[in-house]
Structure formats: C-alpha cells, structure tokens
Amino acid sequence: MERDKPVSVSEFLLLGLSRQPQQQHLLFVFFLSMYLATVLGNLLIILAISIDSRLHTPMYFFLSNMSFVDNCFSTTVPKMLANHILRTQTISFSGCLMQMYFISELADMDNFLLAVMAYDRFVAVCRPLHYTAKMIHQLCALLVTGSWVVANSNALLHTLLMARLSFCADNTIPHIFCDVTPLLKLSCSDTHLSEVMILTEAALVTITPFLCLLASYMHITCVVLRVPSTKGRWKAFSTCGSHLAVVLLFYGTIMSPYFRTSSSHSAQRDIAAAVRFTVVTPVMNPLIYSLRNKDIKGALVKVVAVKFFSVQ
C-alpha cells in the first residue's frame, strides 16, 4: 500500500474548523475577538498585580504566572487567522513540531500551577498562622521554576519522539493546530513507543498534580466543615471559589480527548476540545478571577486610571 512507503514530508495541511466560506468569516471574527480579549484580560491582570503592592502575595504571584501561560496558550490563534487571510492551510514540519512542543509545555504548566495554587489555598485555610512562614518568596519561585523545568522536559520528550517518526504522502491534519494524536495517525512508523510515552505522561504529569490538588481540597473541606458558623464556612470556601471554578474548567476540557489512544479519537471531538482548551479557557480565566475578587477589581481600576491619566 502507498501508505506504507515513507516519504519526506516538509509541510502539513491544517484543515481547521470549517471549509464553508461564510462560516470561515464568522469564525475569523470569533477567534480574533477571543484572542484580543484573552491578551487584554491577562495583560491587565499581570499589570494590576505588578502595580498594586497589596497583591504582592503568593496567591497573586501564581495567578500572574497563570495569566502569562494563558496568553502564551492563545498564540495558536494568530496562525489560524494568518492562514485565513493568506488563503493557505500549510504549516512547515518544523513549525508543526514547535507548535506541538509549546502546546504540550503550556498545558503541563497550567496543570502544575493549578496544583501549586491549591497547595497555597490549603496552607491559607488549614494553616493560617503558618502561612507567612511557609509560603516564602523563595519557595514560590522554586515551585514555579520547577514546574517550568518539568513541563519543558516533558514537552521536549514528546517533540523528540515525534521528530523521529516517518510520515506518508497523506499530510492532512484534521485539526486547528499540530497536536500529538493527529500526527500519530499520519505516521507510517511504529508509533507504539510514542503512544506508551503519551499514556505514561498522562499518568505522571496530569494525574499526579491532580491528586495533589484533590488532596489539598479534601483537607480544606474537612477544615471548613468544622467551622461552627455558616458565615465562617462561606468565607473560607469563597477564598477558593475562583480557583475551583478554573480547576473544573481546565480538567473538564482535557480529561476526555487526551486520555484516549489514537485509534479511538474523533476529529470533531478533538477540535471542539482544542477550541475550549486554547481559545475559551484562556479568556475565561481572567474573568473568573476578577469578577468576584475585590482586590483584583480595585487594582484593575487603578491600572485603567493610571493609563487614562497618563494619556491625558
């Protein structure tokens, strides 16, 4: 069969979401709007945290890092928009591997940061008298740096595994960006090792932080339920509300598509999950964290006021 003959593939075709011209125009406007909202929202949060000294705390340090990661996540959108404007669907082989590398790295970073933020909430709620002594700046910096190192190592491993594969004449990717699973489907090589590594990564890099996060919230729940007053319990839970909403949004998006082997994947389900993961989630996170947080809203007002009066 022709598929069994490896050829030198220099580029791939990203089919995107729709081939209908009218739908493409609507999707272009949608993605452009979401991208601008993501960049603006996350930049405002980063600026607000850096300007307002009251927000120079571990919780907001982790939040500013997550906003940075979310902004980086949305960089897959400009490629889609550029392809629409240029009337092309191509992406180079090296560009595809690079895109896959950054998506894997940033997804892992989001996962690690959510676990780190859960630990921060655990210390704040369950060990309030020791919070300042435990959550020192050096520890916070170490947790974030360690997360970047592990995420980078895992993404690099993924990329090297994909780079060693051979690809056939069929270079069409039914996706909005280069992801591991659709690339495995196109490969003419034996993908068993890559599939095993992906499942191992899912177990170690995804489930382990999730279990740490789950343990933190189990402790938080036990402590909060022992608070005698309803008002006290609500106040304690409210400190975790925004983070818990982001956790549910994140894991609700990634659990389904990334825990199946390549043979059981549906392109439509993968694309829908990818849109939620790389477009919807990054724009929702700043909204979730700012709508119910008086400190963030106050800092955002300060940022807007400073920028407005500086222009005047």
UniProtKB/Swiss-Prot annotation:
Gene Ontology terms: biological process: signal transduction
Record keywords, A-Z: Cell membrane, Disulfide bond, G-protein coupled receptor, Membrane, Olfaction, Receptor, Sensory transduction, Transducer, Transmembrane, Transmembrane helix
GO cellular component term of the entry, any: plasma membrane
Keyword Cytoplasm among record annotations: no
Membrane topology category: Multi-pass membrane protein
Pfam family, one: 7tm_4
InterPro entries per record: GPCR_Rhodpsn, GPCR_Rhodpsn_7TM, Olfact_rcpt
Cystine bridges: 96-188
Top-rank lineage group of the source organism: Eukaryota
All ranges on the Cytoplasmic side of the membrane: 50-57, 120-138, 219-235, 292-312
GO molecular function term, any single one: olfactory receptor activity
Ranges in the topological domain labelled Extracellular: 1-25, 79-99, 158-195, 259-271
Spans through the membrane: 26-49, 58-78, 100-119, 139-157, 196-218, 236-258, 272-291
Subcellular locations according to the entry: Cell membrane
Keyword Cell membrane: yes
Family membership: Belongs to the G-protein coupled receptor 1 family.
Reported function: Odorant receptor.
Name of the protein this chain belongs to: Putative olfactory receptor 1F2
Record gene name: OR1F2P
